Amino acid sequence: DLSGAEAASPKIDHAAEADALKTACEASQAVCTSVLREKKTAAPPKLFDLTSLQREANRIFGYTAKQTLDLAQALYEKKLLTYPRTDSTYLTDDMGETAASTAAMLCGKLAFMEGAEFSPDVSRVLDSRQVSDHHAIIPTMELAKADLAALPESERNILTLAGARLLFAAAEPHTYEVVTAVFQCAGGEFTAKGKTVLCMGWKELERRYRATLKKKPDTDGEENALALDAPPFAEGQSFDRPAVKVTAHDTTPPKQHTEASLLSAMERAGNEDTDPDAERRGLGTPATRAAVIEKLVKSGFVERKGKQLIPTGDGNGLVAVLPDVLTSPQLTAEWENTLTQIAKGKADADGFMRGIEAMARELVQAHPNISDADKARFKEDKPVIGKCPRCGGSVYEGRKNYYCGNRDCAFTMWKNDRFFEERKTAFTPKIAAALLKDGKAKVKKLYSPKTGKTYDGLVLLADTGGKYVNYRATVSRDRELTQQA
């Protein structure tokens, strides 16, 4: 502890060594041996393309990529937001007047700008060379006539986020000075770091915006970890008997992906091995990345846990058994770029397809079948619901059904079967287990489509071996109420 600042030593692997240095320092003098002052600048963020809007909406609000795309599309259809499916983060050079008018309108429309002294410089967001098919996402002037409070909260969040980003991008850079002071004490070296803000710039607007959020998102960037207003250290400055403490730190594994980090990884995938002049790089396009993530979730290869995306056992197994060429981000990125070139008439579609066909033949020849070890990766580890009435195999619960694990058997009971939906009854694993064990299940509060009333009764399994399983509902053994053929 040095005049309110903290100086830290490099990592020490052994606790006894750290304790010995602490004891020595408490009886010694800490002397400042060097002070380095560096002026740094944090440039304003770029405007949103679809992927960056999806990342930020996930980080701040927890929205999935698909939710953000749907919300942006809804705002576009209401003429409140520009076309969302874009990969550009700039406006065209001829949009200067539009951008200036929009920024001025936003200053009076967005609550967090009330009382702010701000003169937007939209020249920073104009560059026709950086615009492909569609320019960056910004609110339209129709917002001036709209009632923000009347919009659904989720749409209002996205519209405000896009408007805030335009104002951030048109603001001054954030500048600050980083001070790095090195101390010697009892033979050990300690480093203190801090910063002094020189100009808040766009971060003042960001601070105002963040203050309006119900839940504060995590901050990123090295400057956020630095102590503000570092003491004015000078070389030769000394501190007698400084306060010293030992802190223990655990290494942490890499964090699981969120949609924000996965979208960023998809955008950058294969970039280091791809031609820097390629028009399209990364996995997917801004318009397709949300659908790719949703398909992984629906297919059971990834599951959502809060904001995190966790690979399932099947997902890990699939990656393990696929040939490396099929899991290469570089290959997919090259295909994406070639498809873009084909769309522009700059590449041969027939030649591209011949290459795909040749690769498919080579893969089939090289990997004619899957090994027993790899097959074992996909063995069912789900609890058995019951025995199949057709073949005696084990029946498991899927996301949408209860199915026989015997691949040669077609027995399946669908959770959304019309029989249960008409009776407003959830087809639970408990009901499924009873049907498989006894051919019947006691169910309370079955709804009668004929009378509009509910009753307690029996659901009977009436499987005839066809494509679909049939059911009957009865109140008693001798009075059948309904039947589905």
Q: What function would you assign to each model-found segment?
A:
Residues 1-74, 78-80:
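Conserved phosphate-chemistry cores used by DNA topoisomerases
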